[in-house]
Curated annotation (Swiss-Prot):
Belongs to the iron/ascorbate-dependent oxidoreductase family. Residues 281-378 form the Fe2OG dioxygenase domain. Binds 1 Fe(2+) ion per subunit. 2-oxoglutarate-dependent dioxygenase involved in glucosinolates biosynthesis. Catalyzes the conversion of methylsulfinylalkyl glucosinolates to alkenyl glucosinolates. Its cofactor is Fe(2+). It comes from Arabidopsis thaliana. This is 2-oxoglutarate-dependent dioxygenase AOP2. InterPro entries: DIOX_N, IPNS-like_FE2OG_OXY, IPNS-like_sf, Iron_ascorbate_oxido_reductase, Oxoglu/Fe-dep_dioxygenase_dom. Keywords: Dioxygenase, Iron, Metal-binding, Oxidoreductase. The gene is AOP2. 2-oxoglutarate binds at residue 369.
Amino acid sequence: MGSCSLQLPLINLADKTLEPGSSKWAEVRSDVRKALQDFGCFEASYDKVSLELQESIMKTMEELFALPVETKQRNVCPKPYVGYLNHNNLSESLGISNANILENINEFTQQLWPHGDGNENISKTIQLFAEKLVEIDVMVRRMVMESFGIEKYIDDHLKSTEYRMRLMKYIAPPEGDANTTVDDYADLLAKLNIDGVEPNVGVKVNADISDDVNANPSVNAGVGANVNADTGVNDNLNVDAEANGDANIAVGGGVNANTDLGVGVNVNSNVAVNAKTGATSGDDVEANDDNEEKKLGLPCHTDKNLFTVLFQHEIEGLEVKTKDEKWIRVKPSPNTFIVIAGDSLCALMNGRIRAPYHRVRVTEKKRTRYTAAIFTCPKPDYVIEAPKELVDEKHPRLFRPFDYRDLFTFYHSEAGRKIQYTLQAYCAVSEA
């Protein structure tokens, strides 16, 4: 058993004196930046989400996922795989675009209850909860941009993004269930084709970690993802999932630098994994055999969007990989939310913030895990470019500007499917 002391930083974002320009704001802003540089994520304490609202969103998810499959399948979107997803009843999710806007949520509930006016109570609960997650996201994004001296771009940046919400349900596989394998989850991830999932099945990776570019696979091959997979299989499956749009971030001396902040993940789903894991807040995370891998509700990955704000309620499951390749098992506590940086933030900040590898590993027998998350997504027709203020001799530019749609096409090309670190292959500056 490893150390029990590892845990994510806990930052209070609900302090009554936490106002922009105040000394408390500067203090918390510094803590947020350090947490994102060191871990790529942190636990946010935010008691502005009442316990009553937390219970309401849980009951809402239970009610939604209890609907017949044919009803849930009405949750559709013009983009494939953005709506309802189900894989062998091991996990399923529902998707809502701009869930902080009541009109959009009403459209969602009307899909499920088309012969009435939707479900007013469910719509209102989702809206209220989404609004609180958006509050956290906006506060953190403002702090990050201020901390790097690019606060003059904040307003344009905030206007350039939109939100996608996912309500998720995970069921722990029964002990000894030989029918549930990593291949099952890889197949699921391939079907999550529009949420930015990029699984690499059976790959053999052993990569180093950089101090400055800590976990951006596009910057440093395998940063934060030291996976030893001795399977002899080198056929990589790269599937991007676009719960994404594009975001316009005005950065860099009058240049309307464009950024892709799409929701997506870069997944390493390895058969016969030898994962050297570390202990976490309370428990060691051991994943040295196939039985442990069967518990994965979502294999190891990095998000591709800007930020994810996650609520996992009472049942744990989220695990985050540290710089030194140890796993932190994040234990839920009241009024806390997990803020996770994505690959797009790494690119936007020129590698100064890391996007952590993380996974979902459900271990509690016969207990269903419900989570809700807001993903900060880009609006259409923009590309990523780090602002000039973040590029200097010590921090040379790591990425060429790129349009998300072109990157997405590359992901699905024959060449893209053969490359593990697709973003790096597509747009990394060669001198970096």
